[in-house]
Every structure is written in C-alpha cells, then in structure tokens.
Swiss-Prot record:
Full protein name: Glucose-6-phosphate isomerase
Homology family: Belongs to the GPI family.
Primary enzyme class: isomerase
Protein's pathway: Carbohydrate biosynthesis; gluconeogenesis; Carbohydrate degradation; glycolysis; D-glyceraldehyde 3-phosphate and glycerone phosphate from D-glucose: step 2/4
Role summary: Catalyzes the reversible isomerization of glucose-6-phosphate to fructose-6-phosphate.
Organism annotation: Malacoplasma penetrans (strain HF-2) (Mycoplasma penetrans)
Stretches assigned to coiled coil: none
Origin organism lineage: Bacteria, Bacillati, Mycoplasmatota, Mycoplasmoidales, Mycoplasmoidaceae
Length: 429
C-alpha cells in the first residue's frame, strides 16, 4: 500500500542500500524486542494488538451508536472535546477520508482554551442542536475539563438532564478517573480507552473511531488497514520492511549528517492534519534526553510562498519527507477564460490535480537538484479509510523503531507535565 521513493535522497538507491546493510543487525535486534514486548516502554504497545484483538462487543456497540448519530438528520453539528492525540489523530482521519465541504454533519473541535473561539462556538450552538463527544483518559486534563463544563452545561440548559445525556458520549478510562465517575453518575454512554495505548497512538481505538463513525467513516475498514500495516511491519529484515527502512534513514540523517529537523511536505489540504499528527508523534516520542529530530510540517504550494525561500537557500539543518496521493478524491478541469487574457491559455483542458503534481515534482527537483536537499517520498494510491489506518499504524511502527534507535523510551512524554504542574499551581493561588 505504501511505496517509498529514494531517487532524491543522497545519491539514490545505491546510498540507501549501504545504509540499510549497516543498520540490518541493529534493526533485527530491536524488532525482536518490540515483537517480544521487551523494549523500552513495552507496557504501552497495545496499539500493535488492538486492530486484531479489540473488544468485538464494544466496537459493535460503538458502530451502532455512531451510525445512529450519523443517520439522525435533525442534528447536524458534532462537537469534539479533545487535545493532543485525543484531537489531532481524530481530525487527521476524518479529514483524510472526507471531502472538505458538504459533509453530512459539521464537526467542531475544542482543543484549546481560546476564549474567543469557545465563546463564538457556544453562541452558535445556543441556536442549534448538537452532539457532544468528550475524550479524556483521566478527565483531569484542564483544557478538556473546562470545555466539558461549558458544553455539557449548554446541553443541560437546552434539553434537560435526559436530553443532555442522549446527546453525549464520553471516551475515557474503563474503570477509573474523573470523567469515568461523571459519566457513570450522569448515566452517559461511554467507550473505553485501552490502558496500554498512549494518546498519540490512540486514534485507532474508540478515541478516534467513534467520531469517525459519527461522520460516516467505515470503522471496520480503518481497523483493517491498521491490522495490515502491523502485519506487514513485523518483518525483521530491513530489506523487506519499509517502516524500518524509513526509520533507519531518519536516524542516519540525524546521527551521521547532523540534520536535526525533518520537514513533512504534503500538497493536499486534507493531509495537513495528518502531518500535525506526525508532528506530535515524533516530537513526543523522540524529544527527550536532549535528543530527537524536530518535526516541521508544510502544506505546499501554500508554504512555498512563506518558508520556501529558507528551504531552497537557507541553513540546511533539515531533510524532507513528502507524502503524496496518486488519485485525488475529486478533480477540476481548467476552463477557457476571457479569451485567455490572463496568459494561462496553455492550461486549458488540463486537470487541477495534474497541475498540482507538476508543482510537486518541480519542487522536488528544485530542492534536490538545485538546493541539494535530501528527500524521502512516501506514495499512496488513494485516500480512504483503509489507507488512513495503514499509514497511521505504519508510522506508529516507524516511531517505535526510531525512538529505540535513539535509545529513548518512545512511549512516554514526561516533559509534558512541566507546564501542567506550573499552571495548576498558579491557578490555585
């Protein structure tokens, strides 16, 4: 499902073959530690098992409830309260599969404490009906706790206790935590977050699957793609495992070429939030003990008109990873216009996706040939549930190997607690 292209990376396939050989033994050893669950952070490898060993009854119930919400034409709005992996991966999946506009339901995400944004959304929803999805393992995440107070209170005011709970689903710990306690007290429908799956790996669990189902995605196809990726990436031989090939090249650029930034490039608006997911995935997994590549995401060609100058001629502290989709979800043909007074008559009859792909290939040529930038290309055929699930789990295996190559625990994020403890101290004064 995934094809890697190394044509514009160093000197091409000859270079990558040498790198793969140099990493083969180390990769095999680390792969065994992952598969045998003996690696650093092994207690949080549940995302590897989930696509094939999930609770069948829970997912059946999740699909039934999400389809019921999706089929209710009277309620057009869905509000998702989540932050980090409880938001980014969810949105990445929905945006990956659906067209940007004219969706069956409008979805709004509350993932910050911006008073202006929250006020504006509350004012809108005072006049309209909506469903509420709150996602928090503990229920003590401040951003989500505050948002849940505000939006559940709004439902309560509009529809009473019974109406509020009918319009709400909580995704949380199966037994403990503040949100679990509230959900049980209020008799709110819940789905559980597995104990052994961290936030940035969790969009393939009820964390993401419920919202995806509400928006009309086929949950089973997402899980099918995930399971296929996990199976494909069990292979210990780096020559046969694209995830480990990519992990090795990333580590090589960091450790041997002193490239400390990775720029993720996409040419489709719908893929932007997948690169936001990658930003979190790699930053939280690798960024510890003074180590790690800093992930940067760019939407081209838009960002070629902002950071393009730096990428072409600036300080080369980075390499690029470009993700592309062969077949667009939809396409547009360029029409004749005002007797071609704009000078663009040579584009008449051409498809917009073709023009976009010419821009992509031209950028790759300019960056690699002229700018001497090393570029890894990741190519997929289609945007759909299965390809999203596959790529999501494929990158999860990449980051597991990448973190272990750096000799860090890829599955914790202790640094995130620093701002939280200071914030709570100040707020309680």
């Amino acid at each position: 499902m995934i094809k890697l292209n190394f044509t514009n990376f160093l000197e091409g396939n000859k270079s990558t073959e040498k790198i793969f050989k140099s990493y083969a033994s180390k990769i095999e050893t680390l792969n065994n530690s992952i598969e045998e669950k003996k690696c650093k952070g092994a207690s949080m490898l549940g995302w590897m098992d989930y696509p094939s060993k999930y609770n069948k009854n829970e997912i059946k119930e999740l699909i039934n409830v999400s389809q019921e919400w999706y089929n209710n034409k009277k309620i057009k709005n869905v509000v998702v309260l989540g932050i980090g992996g409880s938001y980014i991966g969810v949105r990445a999946g929905i945006d990956w599969v659906l067209p940007e506009f004219n969706r069956e339901k409008e979805i709004y995400y509350v993932s910050s404490m911006s008073s202006s944004y929250v006020y504006s959304l509350i004012e809108k929803l005072k006049k309209e009906d909506f469903y509420l999805i709150v996602i928090s393992k503990s229920g003590t995440t401040l951003e989500i706790g505050v948002a849940f107070r505000l939006f559940y209170s709004l439902l309560f005011e509009k529809f009473g206790s019974e109406g509020a709970k009918e319009r709400t689903v909580a995704i949380t710990d199966k037994e403990k935590g503040t949100l679990r306690k509230i959900a049980d007290t209020q008799d709110i429908q819940t789905f559980s977050i597995p104990d052994d799956v961290g936030g940035r790996f969790s969009a393939i669990t009820p964390v993401g699957l419920f919202a995806m189902g509400v928006m009309g995605l086929d949950v089973n196809k997402v899980l099918k793609g995930c399971a296929k990726a996990i199976e494909d990436t069990k292979e210990p031989d780096i020559e046969k495992n694209t995830a480990y090939q990519y992990a090795a090249l990333r580590h090589y650029m960091y450790s041997k070429k002193e490239k400390y930034n990775e720029v993720f490039c996409v040419y489709e608006d719908a893929l932007r939030f997948f690169t936001e997911h990658l930003k979190q995935l790699f930053a939280e997994s690798e960024g510890k003990e003074g180590k790690g590549l800093l992930p940067v995401n760019c939407l081209f060609t838009t960002d070629l008109h902002s950071v393009g100058q730096f990428l072409q001629e600036g300080n080369q502290i980075f390499f690029e990873t470009c993700i592309s989709i062969k077949n667009p979800l939809n396409d547009v043909v360029i029409n004749e216009f005002l007797k071609d007074e704009d000078g663009l008559g040579f584009l008449n009859g051409k498809k917009l996706d073709y023009i976009n792909k010419v821009a992509a290939s031209s950028t790759i040529d300019a960056h690699h040939i002229d700018g001497k930038i090393d570029i890894i290309q990741i190519n997929l055929d289609n945007r759909n549930e299965e390809s999203f699930g596959y790529l999501y789990s494929w990158f999860s295996k990449v980051v597991a190997m990448s973190g272990l190559l750096l000799k860090v625990n890829p599955f914790d994020q202790p640094g995130v607690e620093a701002y939280k403890s200071r914030m709570f101290t100040k707020l309680k004064k």
